[in-house]
Design a protein with these regions (language model features):
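P-loop NTPase nucleotide-binding/switch module
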Residues: 1-13, 138, 144-145, 214
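Conserved beta-strand elements of the Class I
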Residues: 16, 97, 230-232
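Conserved C-terminal guanine-recognition region of P-loop GTPase G domains, centered on the G4
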Residues: 56-61, 80-189, 219-223, 245-255
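Conserved nucleotide-binding/hydrolysis micro-motifs of P-loop NTPases
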Residues: 45-46, 70-72, 101-105, 141-146, ...
Length: 255
């Protein structure tokens, strides 16, 4: 692999981070990259326009991390920010959708369907499925759940992380239902604490598994045509070429 600075942005893996305002998107980016890439604040709507940050993440290689505005931004400029987020989705190779795990556990306990409790996330999940964009659901803020579990441990003598695992399973099953006929789209669910830096290896492993098999492959026609396009190829002929011997342009055309 060449120097990171020599890799054109268009050839890098674009990883888009999506979620509600204050779900921990920017904190997750900083934790995964181990850099202060994004501004983190308790004020909702800190991230406005999408921020594109080129970097290298092992073992994914050269990437572009896209930090987006919350898709529930109801501020004065919120609608325009969400439009910019939709534009970022067009460039995304793998999406990471961040959810607050406490909200997930509460919805599961109350028996509220995912598509109702997380209407925006469900709509974006379906959007990515239709685009065949793999998705990683990151259930964030497990540190708060673990603190609660530690309090229970002191009284019961047992630390139980079952709520976190149950939340992951619930999101996976519910999201499969949301996708419907698009359920074959690849997605995974991980539990993390962006604040404490926990679960980052799980995020990177999920991204690695979801990396499209043909990503980074160079084709003779580049991105000029897609798989199902109808193309007319014109091959030059060389009457002086030996019988049965293909000249280079013919070889390239057949490839």
């Amino acid at each position: 692999m060449g120097n990171l600075n020599e890799t054109p942005s268009a050839n890098r893996l674009h990883i888009g981070i999506y979620g509600k305002t204050n779900s921990g998107k920017s904190s997750l980016i900083n934790a995964v990259t181990k850099q202060e890439v994004s501004i983190v604040a308790d004020v909702a709507g800190t991230t406005t326009d999408p921020v594109y940050k080129p970097m290298e993440i092992h073992p994914l290689g050269p990437c572009v991390i896209i930090d987006t505005a919350g898709f529930d931004d109801d501020s004065e400029l919120g609608e325009r920010r969400v439009e910019k987020t939709h534009l970022a989705a067009e460039k995304t190779d793998i999406a990471v959708v961040v959810l607050d795990i406490a909200e997930v556990i509460a919805a599961k306990k109350a028996g509220v369907p995912f598509k109702k409790a997380f209407k925006d996330e469900a709509e974006w999940s379906l959007l990515f499925a239709k685009k065949h964009t793999p998705v990683v659901f990151a259930l964030n803020k497990i540190d708060e759940i673990l603190l609660s579990a530690e309090a229970q441990e002191k009284s019961s003598g047992k630390l139980d992380n079952a709520a976190i695992e149950a939340a992951k399973c619930w999101v996976y099953e519910e999201n499969s239902a949301v996708m419907g006929k698009n359920a074959d789209n690849s997605f995974e669910v991980v539990a993390v604490s962006a604040l404490k830096g926990k679960g980052m290896d799980a995020v990177i492993s999920a991204l690695t598994r979801l990396l499209p098999e043909d990503f980074g492959q160079e084709f003779i026609l580049g991105d000029l045509v897609s798989q199902t396009d109808l193309v007319l190829l014109v091959m030059p002929q060389d009457i002086q070429a030996p019988k049965g011997r293909l000249i280079l342009p013919q070889v390239q055309t057949l490839r």
